[in-house]
């Protein structure tokens, strides 16, 4: 039987594209296994899929000073040896890496064992993990045309980001019913990323009274960020994190406020959802979300609001403008040529079976 090992973790963005590939890989007869960390978000997500999960040690790749920067390299080295053992025991035909710090030991181990590695980079510029790993990859799938030049050599392949079929099959009716909405107001979905965004959460809650005059609101606010005093507010539903229900939640939305991680913005594109993107600022990130948002704004898929400019008043103004021009955005998204990433990646994997 053909065997593939998937890896990627640290945030949901390093896991969900793997989920999009799993049903097709199963159809093609692959035995699928996964390598991740013991406590990462990837573990619960993957184990819910009933896929064999291997735990390895991994350090975090930081761009700032931290005392752990001196100890984490030893965790990475330990992770490489653990991954080498897994590779030699399981003997996969190919490894697919979605990035994140856990992927680095896995890619190195596969390379040492002569196992082909296909990596995927969602953002315009590669993250630190993929920059370290890409020289050891057979091919690197990229999402944006601008990304091809960021990968050294000629092993970059433009595929786009795979979208889970169940996301496309979600039900607007079920999503609204899940949230208990009792009126026909349009639904505003707020996504702060899998780890949440206190900045977005606070700004939204500071203008909640005005927003609720216009919208029913679904607010995915991140773990530990629920506001207890708002749990009984009519028309306002909070979730720390959404997994299985996400297809219905996304399809229930009429307008979306979101961070600008590549996975979520391509999901919004696939679903043709008018959206206001609030990318992470350069103070909090390497600036990849700013580039992602700029690309989507240029293509006419998204309206953008800089985090440093964001106030309750400006947020309300932007949403009003977005609502007035939503059909223009929808038509632009309908004309997009970026699609079918799942099959493109699967076809690439099949070359190395």
UniProtKB/Swiss-Prot annotation:
Disulphide bridges, residue numbers: none
Membrane spanning residue stretches: none
Residues the entry annotates as binding UDP-N-acetyl-alpha-D-glucosamine: 11-13, 164, 194, 289
Molecular function (Gene Ontology), one example: undecaprenyldiphospho-muramoylpentapeptide beta-N-acetylglucosaminyltransferase activity
Alphabetically ordered keywords of this record: Cell cycle, Cell division, Cell membrane, Cell shape, Cell wall biogenesis/degradation, Glycosyltransferase, Membrane, Peptidoglycan synthesis, Transferase
Keyword Nuclease: no
One Pfam family it belongs to: Glyco_transf_28
Topological type in the membrane: Peripheral membrane protein
Cellular component aspect of the GO annotation: plasma membrane
Record's keyword annotation contains Cell division: yes
EC number(s) from the headed UniProt entry: 2.4.1.227
Main location: membrane
Signal peptide start and end residues: none
Reactions it catalyzes: di-trans,octa-cis-undecaprenyl diphospho-N-acetyl-alpha-D-muramoyl-L-alanyl-D-glutamyl-meso-2,6-diaminopimeloyl-D-alanyl-D-alanine + UDP-N-acetyl-alpha-D-glucosamine = di-trans,octa-cis-undecaprenyl diphospho-[N-acetyl-alpha-D-glucosaminyl-(1->4)]-N-acetyl-alpha-D-muramoyl-L-alanyl-D-glutamyl-meso-2,6-diaminopimeloyl-D-alanyl-D-alanine + UDP + H(+)
Associated pathway: Cell wall biogenesis; peptidoglycan biosynthesis
Entries under CDD domains matching the protein: GT28_MurG
Protein's GO biological process: carbohydrate metabolic process; cell division; cell wall organization; lipid glycosylation; peptidoglycan biosynthetic process; regulation of cell shape
Compartments it resides in: Cell membrane
PANTHER family assigned: UDP-N-ACETYLGLUCOSAMINE--N-ACETYLMURAMYL-(PENTAPEPTIDE) PYROPHOSPHORYL-UNDECAPRENOL N-ACETYLGLUCOSAMINE TRANSFERASE, UDP-N-ACETYLGLUCOSAMINE--N-ACETYLMURAMYL-(PENTAPEPTIDE) PYROPHOSPHORYL-UNDECAPRENOL N-ACETYLGLUCOSAMINE TRANSFERASE 1
Alphabetized HAMAP family for the sequence: MurG (MF_00033)
Function: Cell wall formation. Catalyzes the transfer of a GlcNAc subunit on undecaprenyl-pyrophosphoryl-MurNAc-pentapeptide (lipid intermediate I) to form undecaprenyl-pyrophosphoryl-MurNAc-(pentapeptide)GlcNAc (lipid intermediate II).
Family: Belongs to the glycosyltransferase 28 family. MurG subfamily.
Protein name per its UniProtKB record: UDP-N-acetylglucosamine--N-acetylmuramyl-(pentapeptide) pyrophosphoryl-undecaprenol N-acetylglucosamine transferase
Organism the protein comes from: Clostridium kluyveri (strain ATCC 8527 / DSM 555 / NBRC 12016 / NCIMB 10680 / K1)
Gene this protein is translated from: murG
């Amino acid at each position: 039987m053909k065997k593939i090992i998937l890896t990627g973790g640290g945030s949901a963005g390093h896991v969900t594209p793997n989920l999009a590939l799993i049903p097709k890989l199963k159809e093609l007869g692959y035995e699928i296994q996964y390598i991740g960390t013991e406590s990462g978000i990837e573990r619960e997500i993957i184990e819910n899929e009933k896929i064999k999960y291997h735990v390895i040690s991994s350090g975090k790749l930081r761009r700032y000073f931290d005392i752990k920067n001196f100890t984490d390299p030893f965790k990475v080295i330990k992770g490489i040896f653990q991954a080498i053992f897994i590779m030699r025991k399981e003997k996969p035909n190919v490894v697919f890496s979605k990035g994140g710090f856990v992927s680095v030991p896995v890619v190195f181990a596969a390379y040492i064992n002569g196992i082909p590695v296909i990596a995927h980079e969602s953002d315009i510029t590669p993250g630190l993990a993929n920059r370290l790993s890409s020289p050891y990859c057979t091919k690197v799938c990229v999402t944006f045309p601008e990304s091809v030049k960021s990968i050294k050599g000629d092993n970059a392949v433009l595929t786009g980001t795979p979208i889970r079929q169940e996301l496309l099959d979600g039900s607007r009716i079920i999503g609204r019913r899940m949230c208990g909405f009792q009126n026909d107001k349009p639904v505003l979905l707020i996504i702060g990323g899998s780890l949440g965004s206190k900045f977005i959460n606070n700004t939204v809650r500071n203008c909640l009274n005005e927003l609720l005059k216009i919208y029913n609101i679904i607010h995915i606010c991140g773990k530990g960020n629920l506001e207890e005093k708002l749990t009984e507010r009519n028309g306002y539903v909070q979730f720390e994190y959404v997994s299985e229900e996400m297809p219905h939640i996304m399809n229930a939305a009429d307008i979306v406020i979101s961070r600008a991680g590549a996975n979520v913005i391509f999901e919004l594109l696939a679903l043709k959802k008018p959206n206001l993107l609030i990318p992470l600022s350069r103070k909090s990130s390497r600036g990849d979300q700013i580039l992602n948002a700029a690309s989507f704004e240029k293509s006419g898929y998204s309206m953008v609001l800089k985090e440093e400019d964001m106030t309750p008043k400006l947020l309300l103004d932007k949403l009003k403008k977005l609502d007035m021009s939503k059909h223009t955005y929808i038509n632009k998204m309908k004309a997009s040529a970026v699609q079918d990433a799942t099959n493109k990646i699967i076809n690439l994997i099949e070359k190395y079976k």
